Amino acid sequence: MLISSLLPAVLLIGYVRYRDRRRPEPMMRIIQAVIYGLFSAFLAVPLAMALEGLVYSSGYGIFAVLPFVRGVFSAFVGAAIPEESMKLLMLWLMLRNCDDFDEAMDGIVYAVCIGMGFAGLENVLYVFQSEDGWATTALMRSLLAVPGHYIFAVLMGFFYSLAHFYPRRYRKYRYF
């Protein structure tokens, strides 16, 4: 169960490291980024709960009438915004004074490692929570959730690198 939960994240970290083979990042920085990703998951949970609490404390309003709207809104406010903002915070904390952040590809590598740390922990929690159908859960999350975190991390790292290495031209992306 544990291997099936972590394998997709490990493979995607291996892939992004392979793509960065010209000037690879130190292994300790990669491990540090994965740990930052794990930590971002722990930070995202209380933020998600607080945001959902703010939204739903108003008596639900449109959410009580339209469950679909509630589900979509919950997915963005309760999942996407807290998760991605915490991963971005961890990326910023890691790279703000990092001497190894010396080329644009590095932003992508570190963002992916943070994202895969987050996705790996999330996968483990989901798979161990679904005791009976753990294989199906692991397979579906391997095909959907982990690649989603990977794609978002690549985009985050790309735009973070643009803002870092080309501050005047891409200043508008600095906080995305």
Regions found by a protein language model. Name each.
Residues 1-176:
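Hydrophobic alpha-helical segments at protein termini of multi-pass membrane proteins
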